[in-house]
UniProtKB/Swiss-Prot annotation:
Presence of keyword Ribonucleoprotein: no
Gene3D superfamilies the UniProt entry points to: Jelly Rolls (2.60.120.10)
GO cellular component: cytosol
Species the sequence originates in: Shewanella baltica (strain OS223)
EC number: 2.4.2.1, 2.4.2.2
Entry protein name: Pyrimidine/purine nucleoside phosphorylase
Broad class of enzyme this protein falls into: transferase
Reaction(s) the record says it catalyses: a purine D-ribonucleoside + phosphate = a purine nucleobase + alpha-D-ribose 1-phosphate; adenosine + phosphate = alpha-D-ribose 1-phosphate + adenine; cytidine + phosphate = cytosine + alpha-D-ribose 1-phosphate; guanosine + phosphate = alpha-D-ribose 1-phosphate + guanine
InterPro entries associated with the record: Ppnp, RmlC-like_jellyroll, RmlC_Cupin_sf
Organism taxonomic ancestry: Bacteria, Pseudomonadati, Pseudomonadota, Gammaproteobacteria, Alteromonadales
Superkingdom classification of source: Bacteria
Length: 103
């Protein structure tokens, strides 16, 4: 979905990795939450506290999923799922955007 309707958006951004990754929290009437983020070129490691679905909105990510040794490519319009309490890495060579839905 390219448009989110009837939501509240946090004014303050979530800033990571010296400003190279930034996201905003989006809250829905049913209590669910998503984050919309922008990632500058680089390689980053993240950890989850709950399950997530990461959708690539624009650009391309290479992802090293938990307990794997091979980077996988995810392009615009694709997604990957992560369990709670895991770490994963992403890398990209150009600006990319994502939408994270929490399970």
């Amino acid at each position: 979905m390219s448009l989110l309707e009837q939501v509240s958006v946090s004014k303050k951004a979530n800033i990571y990795f010296d400003g190279k990754v930034a996201s905003r929290s989006v809250f829905f009437a049913d209590g669910s939450k998503q984050t919309l983020g922008v990632v500058q070129p680089g390689e980053y490691e993240f950890s989850t506290s709950q399950g997530e679905i990461m959708e690539v909105i624009s650009g391309r990510f290479e992802v090293l999923l938990p307990e794997t040794t091979t980077w996988q490519e995810f392009n615009e319009g694709t997604q990957f799922e992560l369990a709670a309490n895991v770490s994963f890495k992403i890398r990209n060579t150009a600006i990319a955007e994502y939408c994270c839905s929490y399970l």
